[in-house]
Amino acid sequence: MCGSVGSALELYAPFRVGMSRTLPSVLVLALDTSSAACVAAVVERAEGHAGRRECVLAQRSVVAGRRHGELLAPLLSSVLADAGQQVRDVDAVAVGVGPGPFTGLRVGVVTATALGQALGVPVHGVCSLDAIGAALPGRVAVAGDARRREVYWAAYEDGKRVAGPAVDRPQVLLELGVDRVVGAGATLYAEVLLGLADPTGPQYPPPVLVAHLALGTAGTAGTAGAAGAEGLPGTAGPDRLSPAPPIPLYLRRPDAVLPGPAKRVTA
């Protein structure tokens, strides 16, 4: 298990590991491929005498580089097996919709959409940067590696998004008025960030928080904790961590360019 995922769990208290499925519950399969990692988790929200609780039945992560298409399906099979569940037990799918590089991000979103269609269950998209920023106190920016010497970023104040998501040169983060920057982009451009980079923060979106944001905003009950998102999607402002349709958030065109029409040859 990736250490950054574990640290995010410690930050967010409502999750408990090992709750049995003896109470009315919703089982969510969460995944994210917006970064260099493939991450997945099985999270359960259960109704009990003490109210609603969420727990992590299993989670896994693997640094994929550009092998998301090869590694995601085995990762999902493994995390379901770890949780003692089968794919038919899943009640909803939550997926990080980016922003992220074209190929890796598309793998996760297409897989989540296909699972939802095959199982007849809803698929909820979550901004992948929110899955990091929602659990962090204070004024913080989350930066992912956008390649081309750029970062995907969003800014948060006590778990509420106040700017972004956007794609820019890393120097733009110096103008946000944040106290620290976390994520893979912060690590990659630590020298540019002049002491704002926090290497102890999460590097990749924790799948547990992808599930939590989906549970809190998809109308399944409750709110998204520190994120403060409420109810079904609407026209929420930037400070509201709203649910999203499972559509990739690329923010820019892919590197690959489709060939133009064939040129006519004249005599």
Question: Where do the protein language model's features map onto the residues?
Answer:
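Short, well-ordered alpha-helices that flank and scaffold nucleotide-derived cofactor binding pockets
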Residues: S78, T113, Q117, E191, ...
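Phosphate-handling active-site elements
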Residues: A83-R88, G116-V126
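Intrinsically disordered, low-complexity terminal tails and inter-domain linkers enriched
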Residues: S4-R16, E44-C55, G216-R240
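DPxDG-like acidic metal-binding loop motif
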Residues: A92-P122
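Surface "functional belts" at beta-alpha junctions
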Residues: P14-G18, L23-S25, A46-C55, S61-R67, ...
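N-terminal beta-alpha supersecondary unit
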Residues: Y12-V95
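Glycine-rich phosphate-binding/hydrolytic loop that grips phosphoryl groups
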Residues: G201-G219, G231-P248
